Amino acid sequence: MSHQETHGFQTEVKQLLHLMIHSLYSNKEIFLRELVSNAADAADKLRYLALTNDSLYEGDGELRVRVSADKDKGTVTIEDNGIGMTRDGVIEHLGTIAKSGTAEFFKNLSGDSAKDSQLIGQFGVGFYSAFIVAKRVEVFTRAAGHSADEGVKWESEGEGNFSVETITKAERGTKIVLHLRDEEKEFADDWRLRSIITKYSDHISIPVEMYQEGTPERDGPDGEKIPATEGQWKAMNKATALWTRSKSDVSDEEYKEFYKHISHDFADPLDWSHNKVEGNQEYTSLLYIPAKAPWDLWNRDRKHGLKLFVQRVFIMDDAEQFMPSYLRFVQGLIDSNDLPLNVSREILQDNKVTRNLRQALTKRVLSMLEKLAKDDADKYQQFWAEFGTVLKEGPAEDFANRERIAGLLRFASTHTGDATPSVSLDDYIGRMKEGQEKIYYIVADSHEAAANSPHLELLKKKGIEVLLLSERIDEWLINHLHDYKEKALHSVTRGDLDLGALEDEAEKAAQEKLAQESEPLVERFKSALGDKVSDVKITTRLTDTPACVVTGEGEMSSQMIKLMQAAGQPVPESKPTLELNPTHPLVARLDKEQDETAFAEWAEMLLAQATLSERGSLADPSAFIKLVNQMLLKSVG
């Protein structure tokens, strides 16, 4: 006898439903993911309980989920032959938010039995996602092991009340019928549903089936009879999770094809790493390094991150919580048995478990790159050409792994003689001169400007290698990478160029003598240039150039000033230090100049030339041109 009752949802369910529908789920199609996931839960739950009570199968052990659509009626139906629900279970689990029965089921498990149960979904918000697209939802269910007349029908429009009615249901399990809103009728389409199943549920271990219509008998192209076929239910998902298989059972081709499936990339990946971790946290990761950078790698709004699965059920794309920004090029997935999620299952809880997973996966990627660099330099060079600039963000972002990241960096160098960034810091250290204590580098606007900078003259003469940095991010990188393996990184354009043990006592004595002899010249330059410079000094870093400008210790470099100006940031006023090469013929000639006006003009000329050489531009180029023209006029007059 049918027995119908009307119940009110528990406290504030109406408001919670409204919040979830309009705020928590921005992607409407995930209603199917949630309902298929719940259906697979029910099948997995039955499979586990049937291990100790085979009669629960009722003679039907082929577990499956079936999805169908009726365009005329505007409905979508999701049906499973899983554990089903009793009347009390329906009222409890479909009358509350954040509770689906699965969480209660987990509480009844203990010890190793929990490991063996392939169960997911620890809360009940998922079912209510049906109301994102449905104006009315009907649920028909019967619990396994109960009689046919103990079936239950649940119905609601999601407005605060639901009805529960006793019905007769021959088959165990649950059938959910969604009566779609007029504006959501697009989902009452087989092809639309198939694409969603393939996207979200491809790797659920339970087959997710849709009905494939039969075909009548027909004539073939050569007049032969093609027999009729019967309609049948056919699995839309692969029902296998590649990453759950042993690495030895997966071929390279399968790994490559799976990469293309999850990344939508047409090219093979450069490398991958497949790992299963057991212990306090149990998870499997499958991480890929692409061969090519995506076109929008530098788009600030570009989504990145790993695909997140819980027990092989797809939860979300772009789970960026598991990978730092400087590794945003990494593709792949993480599949966790016990990862905590918040109420919506869309946003990961930022807790200790999540942070530990992030740290472990970051180290895994760095290990991949270290191995690639060690085993296949050409392949690593290919990686660097695509993603090196992104990796340079690492030292600023990830202090804990700064040394490892630094070991992966590649630079152009005076040693190689070309612009290809192929030199590692370890390569540099291995070639350091006896007594050399620092790693020397220069940052410039271009490789040519760096390679031809006058600041390199003495170092080139002594055969000391200098790293040539010319990308916009390099100054930012160096500001967060002060040393490597106890070797300080030192800019050849900053402060005094102290070569330490690389200069003998005779050289140092000669330098001191030259500085003393040039003091009157230095004072004349200071007087002529006034507040245009912070200081004037004699230098030995120059051999072929009359003068250069350098940045004082602790001051902002010219490259950093450019970066901040480009970003619209305020920049503190700074004045360069002018360094003079007194052995250069032009400086020696100026030392003898008696006309202080002419001396001042030449001093300004040398300062402008040195500034242009180091910074690539002048604050007032028109004034410089005026000065040049004025001096040219005098020379031809």
Swiss-Prot record:
PROSITE patterns (UniProt xref): HSP90
Renumbered residue ranges of the record's region A: 1-345
Region (C): 563-637
Gene3D superfamilies from the UniProt entry: 3.30.230.80, 3.40.50.11260, Heat shock protein 90, C-terminal domain, Histidine kinase-like ATPase, C-terminal domain
The entry's keywords: ATP-binding, Chaperone, Cytoplasm, Nucleotide-binding, Stress response
GO cellular component entries: cytoplasm
Compartmental location: Cytoplasm
Single GO MF descriptor: ATP hydrolysis activity
UniProt region (B), positions on chain: 346-562
One Pfam family named in its UniProt record: HATPase_c_3
Homology family: Belongs to the heat shock protein 90 family.
Known partners and oligomeric status: Homodimer.
Function: Molecular chaperone. Has ATPase activity.
Listed PANTHER family: HEAT SHOCK PROTEIN 90 FAMILY MEMBER
Protein's name in the database: Chaperone protein HtpG
Species the sequence originates in: Shewanella amazonensis (strain ATCC BAA-1098 / SB2B)
Gene behind the chain: htpG
